[in-house]
Amino acid sequence: MTVEPPVAIAPDAADLDLLSRGEHHNPHSILGAHPHPDGTVIRALRPHAEAVDAVIGGTSFSLEHLAHGVWGALVPYRDLMDYRLSTTWPGGHNDVSADGYRFLPTLGELDLHLFGEGRHERLWEILGAHRRRYDTPDGTVTGTSFAVWAPNARGVSVIGDFDGWSGRNYPMRVLGSTGVWELFVPGIEAGDLYKFRVHGPDGSVRDKADPMAFATEVPPATASRVSVSTYEWNDAEWLAQRAATEPAQSPMSVYEVHLASWRPGLNYREMAEQLAVHLTETGFTHVELLPVAEHPFGGSWGYQVTSYYAPTSRFGSPDDFRWFVDHLHAAGIGVIVDWVPAHFPKDEWALARFDGTPLYEHSDPQRGEQLDWGTYVFDFGRREVRNFLVANALYWLDEFHVDGLRVDAVASMLYLDYSRPEGGWTPNIHGGRENLEAVAFLQETNATVHKQHRGVVTIAEESTAWPGVTRATNVGGLGFNMKWNMGWMHDTLGFMAHDPVHRSYHHHEITFSLMYAWSENYLLPISHDEVVHGKGTLWTRMPGDDYAKAAGVRALLAYMWSHPGKQLLFMGQEFGQTAEWSEERGLDWYQLDDPYTGGFHRGLLRLVHDLNATYREHPALWTLDTSPGGFSWIDANDTANNVLSFLRYGTDGSILACLFNFSGSPHANYRVGLPERGEWREILNTDAEIYAGSGWGNLGAVTATSQPWHGRPASAEVALPANGAIWMSLER
């Protein structure tokens, strides 16, 4: 039966007006259930409804339309425990739901305090969209809670496909002075799309994607998606082994991949299966992914992120990406992701001017804009922004089990005058150019990551001589495990581009990196940046015909793998792709089957496999990467023959001799000094016939006698192939 209530209680007209405009800071003070001397006042916001009833214990009480879509009634229950709202819509459709405005806040005081202090290390558990279940007297209620930080907003509402994107149905409340807006909405399920309608202090109204969204629509669509993980991990053994490993003293050979163009058309799971096979066949220990966080513009390669907490939906769901990582772990392959905390794009629907003011970006244009890229720079000194980023680093490690973060564009963060004209930057409090807030942020990120995740590696793309990038934070360093050695990359590629007859005049270019090889813990990169924008590829940088180019690439890679430091190679370079990389098409795998040059490409691919296998087998190539004691020159100055040679030492006492002939002529009886006499086995020869070389070599080994040479007590005559490399191991 239906009982007509004796009176309808209308709220203050000013409150109704604010509510109708989506600008009320506490809609829960109007909507929901409120005590009254004669019972309980129930109010509901149903702007398009034809009728609304409150259903209490099987009895329906009609609500009166008060104004602006607000319905209300006084019901004769002083201690109302529960009720439902029955809504009749145009066309006669009726639904019954719980009232989201009668639920307590989903964030506790401690959570809000920690966020306000910038110290909530699991921020993703309190902000964003979270599915919830409540057991109430009238039955179970399920739905989604939403929480977003927008301290300067005049009002925030949840909008989505569940309300026709109207923005009138679900205004949120602000929790105290934190600037966090919150609301629980019954009935919203995993997969539903949503945004926040944010009313700025300037009168602007913008529909914003959730900064903490765990999933998104497929670009170019921009909505956030409610997401719940049901994935069950299978990599406990991998994680335990990782925690017991010291990255600097372990083998690390990284294959850099842009997912969309490695083999186009694959999803996360298909890519994981095919990548695992390729990486196992080539022997890489890790894969590094260009940014996988959601980004609207594919041409940015992922470096203009709009949803920092969501793997791109181009290839599947967040659980599909979890499967991707899990599958590679099962194959014995670590996963590193590129992370972009330096800047973010100006898309109006994303982080930019989120609450109508500079919020995530610095308010000073001289610190808040990256002029080269047309992007905004994070305000690293703001506690909540710093918390957003530090928690994001932890999120990828906790939620997706990734094994490392390669931090992009670190130099742009460290210097206030980075790429700025004279007079276009503001000094720090000491009058210097260092961005002290960014330094503190990087230190906090690295210290927190390493405290919580032993064995995880953080890598800096830092292109200047900033001191202490890989020094521990407790002694003033930035705290990274490794830094890209951009100087090595520049000098080595420049040297190899010279014709062999001219290389002797540029010998210093190939040896200079050993002057500073232990100033930081380095990773040697031949990355995506070196095979685009007219730079060519490894193959096309080499002088000569295809035979000479193949030999040059093989020699370069052997030098790279034996040089102190870990190594990274961008996809396609492992088989010598001749065309520059483009994100718009896949790799030229067909070159492996080319009837004329395919042998060279297959030979290079085989060499990369053998480089990685030999590298892993010989601790001399990786256990002392960060110590000068792991390296010793035999001869760095043989410019006449265009030869350089050095020794690598392992913590197990093993010794390798690495010899490189960068001239265009072989040396038949090249005498090289060695630390001990005896048999030195040839463990790698880049000119071997299996690599499409000439087969010039040493028949498997040379014997060192007691004849001193190069300041060493022993020596041997070695056959050095033209444009080639030889590695030898002392047999004891």
Curated annotation (Swiss-Prot):
Signal peptide: none annotated. Its EC number is 2.4.1.18. Pathway: Glycan biosynthesis; glycogen biosynthesis. InterPro entries: A-amylase/branching_C, Branching_enzy, GlgB, GlgB_N, GlgB_N_E_set_prok, Glyco_hydro_13_cat_dom, Glyco_hydro_13_N, Glyco_hydro_b. Keywords: Carbohydrate metabolism, Glycogen biosynthesis, Glycogen metabolism, Glycosyltransferase, Transferase. One of its GO terms (cellular component) is cytosol. It catalyses: Transfers a segment of a (1->4)-alpha-D-glucan chain to a primary hydroxy group in a similar glucan chain. GO terms for molecular function: 1,4-alpha-glucan branching enzyme activity; cation binding; hydrolase activity, hydrolyzing O-glycosyl compounds. Belongs to the glycosyl hydrolase 13 family. GlgB subfamily. Monomer. This is 1,4-alpha-glucan branching enzyme GlgB.
